């Protein structure tokens, strides 16, 4: 959110922090779905981040995915994940913006696809047994607005 120019507002209210599987980064149409992976979970018109960490529902060690129904955003995400490059030969590409080196390796992708072959039809959301440290305790977030 911050790197995209948005404002982060921390909400400490119980009703906001009692989530399971998925939560929205309000007021944006962005959902963190790192603890959910099941059929028909996508919410139209949103950007939904999935995580494939070893402790998540599709444990391929690292990586993730952004679900969206916005074709323009999907094209941008594809370029952004691979240093701003298109899906062309490097010699034929014209890089128009700085991206990141965040693409999934072919081996990781193949492992994930293989795991999907036996993925359960219905999967429960993961909980967060140990919780997360309050981000407002970190110096980098001290000056952000907080709702009590």
Predicted regions and their residues:
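PLP-dependent aminotransferase-like
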Residues: 1-40
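Proline-centered loop/turn at the N-terminus of a beta-strand
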Residues: 28, 46-47
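Active-site region of PLP-dependent enzymes
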Residues: 38-39, 47-148
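Nucleotide-sugar donor-binding and catalytic loop/hinge architecture
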Residues: 43
């Amino acid at each position: 959110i911050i790197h995209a120019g948005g404002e982060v507002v921390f909400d400490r209210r119980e009703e906001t922090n009692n989530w399971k599987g998925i939560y929205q980064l309000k007021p944006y149409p962005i959902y963190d779905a790192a603890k959910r992976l099941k059929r028909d979970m996508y919410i139209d018109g949103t950007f939904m981040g999935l995580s494939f960490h070893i402790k998540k529902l599709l444990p391929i060690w690292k990586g993730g995915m952004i679900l969206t129904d916005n074709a323009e955003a999907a094209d941008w995400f594809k370029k952004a994940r691979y240093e701003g490059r298109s899906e062309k030969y490097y010699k034929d590409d014209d890089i128009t913006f700085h991206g990141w080196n965040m693409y999934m390796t072919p081996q990781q992708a193949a492992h994930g696809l293989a795991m999907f072959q036996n993925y359960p039809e219905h999967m429960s959301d993961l909980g967060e047994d140990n919780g997360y440290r309050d981000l407002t305790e970190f110096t980098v977030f001290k000056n952000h607005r907080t709702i009590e």
